[in-house]
């Protein structure tokens, strides 16, 4: 039986099962009923459309005028050669978004993906077949390999390259071969009405499934960020998360939990210090300036605060100082009430 709530439960469990170098199962739970598919479906679409990959975008073959031409000494015609070429999955070495790579083969030979590896690019499906040439053939071609997302048709590539020597290719950039999801029922706090999302991601080897999933998440966050300009949701979520994190530390506990000597405790109590977090927010000089706090008590407090991981005047809190101050003020107001 469900309780009446004012907000949906935020999932807390997340696992990644790497089945192989190219396949992974990514699970998250527990989701409220209906929330699983609400998040899984757009993530699946983004895995296909927004994951960065590499593809050949254009080719120039010496002695070949167009893709329907033939080449002396090569078993395949040019059209079949290009089909085989587009099946090769490239990676650019280094940080470049585009590489123009030259290849040359001569004499009787079967050419595979591994034969195109060089200092500029790598073919991840090394055993993929490309072409066969005889002893009289000399195959020379220049290939443009680019980084991108999704799919770009050859008509658009042709306009972008604007070079009649090159044959434009349909560019399939996405390295995600398959992305599926299952929504499973999961028991949470004795309640079976929660969901578990299981995403199965398969890539072609250009990137790992984990990297593909991270790309999809980043794309989703960026697309949703436009709404944050007017709603400030991200700040609210961050503050809520930080508040929860603070509650899990000693900072919101009473100073009695520090087991201070009676002299040190009484001095802090008279100064109105109630919570451990107040000591972390003070500088050493501010603490030393408390009325009747001697050097022995000062050293005792400093040592104990350091032992719990929050030295007096700690820089750990950084941006969370205001949140901690507000939380302490809220607790004090509740106690006074």
From Swiss-Prot:
Its EC number is 2.7.7.6. It is an enzyme of class 2 (transferase). One of its GO terms (cellular component) is DNA-directed RNA polymerase complex. The N-terminal domain is essential for RNAP assembly and basal transcription, whereas the C-terminal domain is involved in interaction with transcriptional regulators and with upstream promoter elements. Homodimer. The RNAP catalytic core consists of 2 alpha, 1 beta, 1 beta' and 1 omega subunit. When a sigma factor is associated with the core the holoenzyme is formed, which can initiate transcription. DNA-dependent RNA polymerase catalyzes the transcription of DNA into RNA using the four ribonucleoside triphosphates as substrates. This is DNA-directed RNA polymerase subunit alpha. It comes from Campylobacter jejuni subsp. jejuni serotype O:2 (strain ATCC 700819 / NCTC 11168). The lineage of its organism: Bacteria, Pseudomonadati, Campylobacterota, Epsilonproteobacteria, Campylobacterales.
